[in-house]
Amino acid sequence: MTETDLLRGPVHDLHGELGATFAEFGGWQMPVAYAGTVGEHQAVRTTVGLFDVSHLGKATVAGPGAAQFVNATLTNDLGRIHPGKAQYTLCCSADGGVIDDLIAYYVADDEIFLVPNAANTAAVVAELAAAAPAGVTVTDQHRDYAVFAVQGPRSAQVLAALGLPTEMEYMAFADAAWDGRPIRVCRTGYTGEHGYEVLPRWADAEPVFRALLEQVRAADGQPAGLGARDTLRTEMGYPLHGHELSREISPVQARTGWAVGWRKPQFWGKAALEQEKAAGPRRILMGLKAIDRGVLRQGQPVLRDGEPVGETTSGTFSPTLKVGIALALLDTGAGLEPGAEVAVDVRGRRLRCEVVKPPFVPSRTS
């Protein structure tokens, strides 16, 4: 895919004005960094950062019984929440592989708003549309809404300055307005910090982003690119589809079984996942913290006593811990517990690492 083939978000030119460097994410050209990933990461941990994640998908399932239909297909149990709350969930295939992980917003019994990953939106919409009963529609709204994430300890201060709602529980959302423009405000995020995701209409994106940026800077924050978003989520052990989740990596292996409604009568992949859970997965997601100096990356062999016992799925330098960290799928048969020492083959060099159970840093989402 060439640069000219990449899709662009609603404030792409503004990112250029801000000095962003760009990279491809899910078929979209998105800002990877502005002043620098480490500084942007630290801003989110200490003050506040503003991300443009408008490449994320958006879709609406609507019609009589929409919530019931979504509950019978996606893994998590919508019965655990109510209108005004959101839920992390997964769209699985019959064999238990993950087509995508996504957020489901319970708007009403007849309306569920979904935010899938950019590259998987079309697949999720197609799967749901093909299975939808009469009267239930599944509409791809990828370019109807922008998504801006305001994340960090001062995120509430930023939204309050614009008159947007901030007093809500984690994973709650509210429909509001700024300057006459409708905005959905969600107490969600992908950083492990207190934060919000703000969804204005696509056409309203630039004035909303500029207003948020002004308040972020007033709070000693800065715009942050998707490079920082990745280091932040890796520190939290949050999975990224294509890395820790895929059609070959199940929720049981990726430690996202908490997002599966095991007691529900049905959801896609239920039989396969129940079987894997009962038997025990052949591999499990763990964290690795480098003992030796070095940076870990995806796809590197993990060794114990020179024998392969797994592979890294994501890796980075942790700006918080100031060491290399990784997420890795480790063979359960190897019996590796937190505290065990392994080695990662980094281009022929054996980098010693300690096995840890994620997250690497405490969550502060509440």
Curated annotation (Swiss-Prot):
Coiled-coil zones:
none
| InterPro entries noted in UniProt | GCS_T (IPR006223), GCS_T_bac (IPR022903), GCST_C (IPR013977), GCV_T_N (IPR006222), GcvT/YgfZ/DmdA (IPR028896), GcvT/YgfZ_C (IPR029043), TrmE/GcvT_dom1 (IPR027266)
A cellular component term, taken from the record's GO annotations: cytosol
Q: What is its EC number?
A: 2.1.2.10
Keywords from UniProt, A to Z, are:
Aminotransferase, Transferase
A Gene Ontology biological process annotation?
glycine decarboxylation via glycine cleavage system
Instruction: Check the record and name the Pfam families matching this protein.
Output: GCV_T, GCV_T_C
Provide the top EC class.
Answer: transferase
What reactions does this protein catalyze? Answer: N(6)-[(R)-S(8)-aminomethyldihydrolipoyl]-L-lysyl-[protein] + (6S)-5,6,7,8-tetrahydrofolate = N(6)-[(R)-dihydrolipoyl]-L-lysyl-[protein] + (6R)-5,10-methylene-5,6,7,8-tetrahydrofolate + NH4(+)
Gene Ontology molecular-function annotations: aminomethyltransferase activity; transaminase activity
Q: Keyword Transferase, does the record have it? A: yes
Q: Which domain of life is it from?
A: Bacteria
Q: Main role?
A: The glycine cleavage system catalyzes the degradation of glycine.
- To which protein family does this belong? Belongs to the GcvT family.
Stored HAMAP family: GcvT
Assembly with partners or alone? The glycine cleavage system is composed of four proteins: P, T, L and H.
This chain's protein is named Aminomethyltransferase
